[in-house]
């Protein structure tokens, strides 16, 4: 592994390292997963400022029976406003003149996708697919005008967790570079004492009758 340490990180470098492991260990099957925090410059909504958003990403290579497959995993952090709560807040204002605010919360979508052989899918591509699906990504640089713009964006895109999962799936299904995938959407409720979670899969790769009991705890992003 260390002889590849100075190379620019890519699936190709991972493949070279995996080949070395297979040769050195005389192994039939092998798996290599690399996790990283990827910095991407993101512009604020209204003030024109920008800063770095850090994305939890993992690349994975799996070889079984002589067949090699590539996977990418992304945690996309966004804000979700409850559609029901939004309507109730508006009703309180219009019916009783009572100021009310809808509940919203930090939410996380973990997108796990298979990259089709011969195709190029990179971090920015998967991040952009997530943004297209649910545009209320948490912000990096925030002035008052950005906070107002974010409030407007959330009000224009209220969403239940099931609908968020469907929107992510819609984007992934529409990209020919992506094969099997799994979407886990977790809305970490500010109203309820439990989180709302939705899981959708496409294909057999991520389908399972059992889920790791610690999986959902890893979706907490305290940043």
Walk through the language-model features, giving the residues of each.
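N-terminal intrinsically disordered, cationic/polar leader segments
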Residues: 1-223
């Amino acid at each position: 592994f260390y002889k590849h340490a100075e190379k620019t990180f890519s699936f190709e470098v991972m493949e070279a390292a995996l080949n070395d492991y297979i040769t050195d260990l005389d192994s039939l099957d092998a798996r290599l997963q690399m996790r990283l925090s990827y910095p991407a410059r993101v512009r604020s909504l209204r003030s024109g400022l920008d800063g770095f958003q850090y994305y939890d990403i993992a690349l994975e290579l799996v070889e079984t029976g002589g067949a090699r497959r590539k996977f990418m995993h992304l945690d996309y952090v966004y804000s979700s406003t409850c559609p029901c709560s939004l309507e109730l807040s508006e009703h309180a204002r219009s019916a009783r003149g009572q100021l009310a605010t809808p509940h919203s919360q930090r939410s996380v979508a973990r997108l796990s996708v298979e990259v089709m052989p011969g195709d190029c899918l990179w971090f920015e591509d998967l991040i952009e697919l997530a943004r297209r699906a649910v545009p209320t990504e948490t912000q990096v640089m925030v002035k008052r005008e950005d906070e107002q713009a974010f409030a407007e964006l959330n009000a224009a895109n209220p969403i239940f967790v099931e609908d968020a999962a469907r929107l992510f799936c819609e984007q992934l299904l529409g990209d020919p570079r992506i094969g099997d995938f799994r979407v886990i959407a977790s809305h970490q409720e500010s109203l309820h004492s439990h989180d709302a979670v939705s899981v959708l899969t496409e294909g057999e790769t991520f389908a399972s009758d059992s889920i790791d009991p610690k999986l959902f705890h890893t979706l907490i992003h305290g940043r």
